[in-house]
Amino acid sequence: LWEMAINILTNYQLIVIIIMVMQMENKQISSKEQVENFLLELKHIINDKKFNINEDFDILLKKKNETDDDAYTTKNTLIQLNYDKNDIIRNLKELKISEYIETLTDVKNVYSPQFWVFIKRINLKQVYIKVKIRSIQNRKIFCISFHFARFQVNNFPYG
């Protein structure tokens, strides 16, 4: 059966299926307690007097495969919202467990901390936020996504 399917599907279709399966394996719903602990630690780092937004917070404005005219990039979302790093930090401090979506393994480095995904409503639009604490000891936060959601999200495990 697999041989027939492989003969019928194009290489592109196979790649898409493989990516989808890999993504499904990398997703999980963390317990309510785990999400609460993550949010407490995130807020603790941000509220620490030693936290320096320019040294301790990184954001990926544009991924390699994104085009400049893509409305769903972090860079273009920030422009449309008239946001800077301080606004992102403010929104991270305001995250609630009810806005949690899922937890993802960092596929580029499975041994690094996981990404935590949230959807926050800003100016009547859903904003997709994917963030991790890179290092608790060094107090580093990495936000890989802060952009308008490409699709409406309605599945909030604790919302």
Stretches found by the model and what they are:
Residues 133-159:
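Enriched for short, Lys/Arg-rich terminal
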Residues 13-14, 84, 101, 159:
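Compositionally biased, intrinsically disordered low-complexity regions enriched in proline and serine
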Residues 2-4:
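Tryptophan (W) side chains
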Residues 7-10, 14-20, 59:
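Short, positively charged and aromatic/hydrophobic N-terminal segments
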Residues 93-140:
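Functional cores of ribonucleases/endoribonucleases
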Residues 24-112:
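Compact soluble domain cores
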